[in-house]
């Protein structure tokens, strides 16, 4: 599994509301695959109710400014032997361990060819009002916890420089991007040199049937 922290704009009410609304979209998840850790007094998990619950906690501690939430995505390879229900339990356990003391919305998306679990965490603790902070060291510890939980369940641990099956990624090997990643990359870094290079490579890959043809197009 890969646990990625989404570092987008997280300091406005609108951004938090939009994130919660997206995570709970009915075409991506279901009621049985959603949960909120910590205090949540509603029977139904609805994006507006979750949003208002997070806001109430912030206002209770007079900490309704700055970073509003954290967003993590735990994803599994399409060939991983894991069910949506197992991914859901994984996400809940991770949230309760890593984000202990903070309300976290857990929702599994199963609309893609790979299962992934979204965690949206309130930035203010319901225990003592402290703000959520993640350092580089914290991110490494987060990775270690994810790997430990995978190991306990017999799931694959992602290793840098290796494919899902454990084989080495050869130097110079081209790894295809999916459409969503490409569009996100294009939107965020459209004007950068790196983006131009990536787009040129992706364009050249279209309809290529051999390495020689790819080199010719480049």
Language-model features, listed with the residues they occupy:
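N-terminal nicking endonuclease/strand-transfer module with a His-rich metal-binding environment
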Residues: 1-217
């Amino acid at each position: 599994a890969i646990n990625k922290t989404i570092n987008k704009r997280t300091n406005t009410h609108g951004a938090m509301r939009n994130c919660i609304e997206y995570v709970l979209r009915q075409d991506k998840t279901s009621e049985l695959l959603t949960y909120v850790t910590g205090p949540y007094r509603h029977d139904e998990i609805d994006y507006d109710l979750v949003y208002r619950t997070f806001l109430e906690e912030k206002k209770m501690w007079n900490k309704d400014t700055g970073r509003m939430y954290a967003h993590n995505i735990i994803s599994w390879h399409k060939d991983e032997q894991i069910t949506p229900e197992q991914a859901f339990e994984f996400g809940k356990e991770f949230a309760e361990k890593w984000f202990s003391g903070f309300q976290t919305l857990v929702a599994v998306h199963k609309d893609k060819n790979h299962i992934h679990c979204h965690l949206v965490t309130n930035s203010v603790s319901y225990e003592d009002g402290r703000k959520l902070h993640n350092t580089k060291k914290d991110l490494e510890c987060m990775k270690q916890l994810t790997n430990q939980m995978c190991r306990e369940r017999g799931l694959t641990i992602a290793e840098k420089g290796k494919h899902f099956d454990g084989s080495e990624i050869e130097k110079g090997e081209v790894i295809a991007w999916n459409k969503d990643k490409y569009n996100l990359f294009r939107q965020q870094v459209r004007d950068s040199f790196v983006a131009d290079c990536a787009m040129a490579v992706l364009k050249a890959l279209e309809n290529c049937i051999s390495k020689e043809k790819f080199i010719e197009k480049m």
